[in-house]
Amino acid sequence: MSFLKKSLLLVLFLGLVSHSVCKEEKRETEEENENEEENHEVGSEMKRYAFWYPNRDTEEKNENEEENQEEGSEMKRYAFGYPKREPEEENENEEENHEEGSEMKRYAFEVVGGEAKKMKREPEEENENEEENHEEGSEMKRYAFDVVGGEAKKMKREPEEENENEEENHEEGSEMKRYAFDVVGGEAKKMKREPEEENENEEENHEEGSEMKRYAFDVVGGEAKKM
């Protein structure tokens, strides 16, 4: 009996020891896992700080970024003297500013209500005035050159009269040329002989010249004298 008791006690003791050992191992394992997680977080934290990224959760980070963006835009607006306005108010104010700017431009160019004043005439009036100015300018030119009603004065003769005068001047000039060279009615005077007479005279002169040459060399009838 004593042996059995001792063996049971030993088994129980060994069971307790093994159970405690298992618990210890389990605890150590959990601690190791926790340490690994902590080390991982620490390592990631160190990396984030090394690259100037603070440790923040994703949601908080997004929220903070949005808040910072809004605050930054608000600071810019205050820095430039623009108070914070709601989007609807901003759109309304932009429309009002656009209308005011267009109104100012219209007044600056003396345009009210989209209708041009005397300073700016309508296209139709401008066309009419341009036509009137063109007519007035042509009328002034016509008076400047002594031309009234499209009819030329004595200062400027009509094309037909000019052509007639040109023909008369041409005839007078040809007549003067004919008188200058003693030619009247197309018939040459004694001063200028006709071509036929000139040819006859040339033949006579040629014969006389040949006769003179023959006498100069004492050759008569083509036969040499005793000389």
UniProtKB/Swiss-Prot annotation:
Modified residues (Glycine amide): 113, 149, 185, 221
Region (Disordered): 22-227
Compartment(s): Secreted
Biased composition (Basic and acidic residues): 73-87, 99-108, 135-144, 171-180, 207-216
Residue stretch(es) of the prosequence: 21-46, 57-75, 86-104, 115-140, 151-176, 187-212, 223-227
Amino acid composition bias (Acidic residues), ranges on this chain: 30-39, 62-72, 88-98, 124-134, 160-170, 196-206
Expressed in which tissues: Expressed by the skin glands.
GO molecular function: opioid peptide activity
Keywords: Amidation, Amphibian defense peptide, Cleavage on pair of basic residues, D-amino acid, Endorphin, Opioid peptide, Repeat, Secreted, Signal
PTM sites of type D-alanine (Ala): 50, 79, 108, 144, 180, 216
Family per record: Belongs to the frog skin active peptide (FSAP) family. Dermorphin subfamily.
Name of the featured protein: [D-Ala2]-deltorphins
Organism placement in taxonomy: Eukaryota, Metazoa, Chordata, Craniata, Vertebrata
